[in-house]
Amino acid sequence: MVLVGLQGSGKSTWTAAALAGTHAVVSKDHWPNARRREVRQRRVVADLLAEGRSVVVDNTNPAPEDRAALIALARGAGVPVRAVWFDTPPAVCARRNAARQGRARVPPAGLYGTLARLVPPSTDEGFARVDVVRAAPA
């Protein structure tokens, strides 16, 4: 499963509530100081899939080119891959992000940089399905 959405869109919160104990959660946020986090993430995902584990990739994954390698890994493992699109208004994401503490807070330029690249996922990319999670009214 590949999560797609801005920082502050609710990806990690949703994962904790909806997938507690059922999926291995892989996030580049787990290795904030690591070099080549993208390569490390792909290796961890591949290893987990090879073990037969259900995996959720909890990152922004804003554009098709960011998601392509993850889709290829799942297909290579013979696993259908699903996207979950967090359709949260940017203003809500910015407000949630501003309330975060420490490393969890992303600089506004980072959030808006992600927004500039954000393309909703599509089955045309190779996802078996795309589910949508909308933000609760604020």
Locate predicted features.
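Short, hinge-like loop/turn segments at secondary-structure boundaries
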Residues: 42-46, 74, 99-103
